[in-house]
Structures are given as structure tokens and as C-alpha cells.
Amino acid sequence: MPFTPIHLGPGAACKAIGGRHFSFMVFGGAQVLMDIEPLLGIIQGWDVLHGYSHTLVGALLIGLLAALIGRPISTWVLKALQVEHYPLTWLAACTGAFIGTFSHTGLDALMHSDMNPWWPLVDGNGWHGFISIDELHLLCLGLGVFGALLVVGKYRRYGRA
């Protein structure tokens, strides 16, 4: 799922459930960082688009980077836009970053055959084709709708999501 907002559906559900303990902005940034390698692969014409970045090790390292740069960037953006929000803690940044990178790897493993998501533990991609691409997209969109409805409900009830 390169360069698509469909990855954001599960993030919206996580934000709705996790509240101030989950940064949706850092989650979104992690999605972008995860797809730098496939973008370079498309531009360069590589045979394998989803390489090391889409493995357990890659998700861990990119998650760490996403948390470290995502917290200060997100804090600055929210302040610049004067958006009322909970303080962005390191816990929220790390939760958003690591759920972002590991969910990205898992979702892409269902869709892309060129992955080795469990490397270095296992070679190959046993998850590919477990569900259809249409079912995967519906799942992600459904989670996004669920998350949005939950956030709206919390906002109406408490005045803050």
C-alpha cells in the first residue's frame, strides 16, 4: 500500500482507543518514513520494492527514528497551528511510531509478495495473500470509520477526544 491513506485507518482506531497515549501525527509520519524505500525502488526500477525497511529490524529502526524526530516536529506543528491538544509525551510518540511501523509491515506483508517481514528470523512471506487486497482495504477503511466515530463520540461527550 505505498503512498496511500489506507494505512491511516488502523491509526485512527488506535488514536480513538489510546487517546493522549497515542500520537496520530507521529503514526502518520512513520507511514511516510516506511515508504521511502519503496519510493526509491519505483524511481530506480528495483526488482524488490519492500526490502529491509519492511522487516522486523527495519520497522524497529524506522520506529525509533519516527519517535525521535516525530515528537519535536509534531509539537512544533501543533503549536504553530495553535491546535489545542494534550501534551505530546515520549510514550505517545513511541506508541504512535512503533504501532505505525509494525502495523505498516504487517499490512504490507498481506499485500506484497516481495517482502520478508520476519527477517532475520524467517525468510519469505507467509502472510502474503492471507486475505484479498479488497478485504484488506475494507478492513483498513472500516477501522478508520470506527476510529472517526469513536473520536466524534468522545468529543461530544467530554468536549475533547
Q: Where are the regions that the model predicts?
A:
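N-terminal membrane-targeting hydrophobic helices
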Residues: 1-161
